[in-house]
């Protein structure tokens, strides 16, 4: 269900940007509000899904003491998504391509992964470190200086 809302959010994000360009309307406040909505849809939503999975995952015995607080590590994704969106708003180089992983791609990755492989990811205790590394890697990809393909349409 959460994945469907992320997909719906991605569709609305695409169409609101396209309609603003077609109607030639933009404002600084609109740009910031769009980024805020994007952070909720593509940052907080996937982080909440990851949080829920981290709460029920099998933990290795060495990390069992971390069970009460470790699920909150999921919100690193939301923080890095907000940072990525802030960088995007200020970076003039991202007119034809993206620099760093776009937040919708990251959200769709996490939503798809946790929707389709939830049992596989939560049951073996050795998967917890894998998921934590994936959180770090995807967060880094959001803000790294790596050029990425973009589906951007010119007016």
Segments the model singles out, each with a brief description of its role:
Residues 95-155:
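C-terminal membrane-associated helical module and adjoining short loops/tails
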Residues 1-32, 69-78, 134:
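Membrane-embedded alpha-helical segments that form the functional core of polytopic membrane enzymes
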Residues 1-4, 47-72, 113-130:
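Helix-coil boundary and interhelical linker segments in multi-pass alpha-helical membrane proteins
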Residues 1, 37-43:
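Functional transmembrane alpha-helices
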Residues 16-20, 41-48:
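Alpha-helical transmembrane segments and their lipid-water interface positions
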Residues 6-13, 76-87, 114, 134-145:
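Alpha-helical transmembrane segments of multi-pass membrane proteins
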């Amino acid at each position: 269900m959460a994945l469907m809302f992320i997909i719906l959010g991605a569709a609305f994000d695409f169409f609101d940007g396209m309609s603003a360009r077609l109607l030639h309307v933009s404002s600084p406040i609109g740009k910031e509000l769009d980024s805020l909505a994007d952070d909720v849809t593509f940052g907080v939503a996937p982080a909440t899904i990851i949080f829920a999975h981290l709460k029920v995952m099998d933990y290795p015995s060495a990390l069992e003491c971390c069970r009460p607080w470790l699920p909150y590590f999921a919100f690193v994704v939301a923080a890095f998504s907000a940072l990525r969106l802030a960088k995007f708003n200020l970076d003039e180089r991202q007119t034809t391509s993206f620099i760093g992983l776009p937040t919708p791609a990251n959200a769709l990755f996490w939503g798809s992964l946790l929707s389709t492989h939830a049992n596989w990811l939560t049951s073996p205790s050795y998967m917890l470190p894998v998921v934590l590394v994936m959180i770090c890697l995807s967060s880094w990809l959001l803000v790294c200086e790596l050029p990425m393909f973009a589906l951007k349409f010119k007016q």
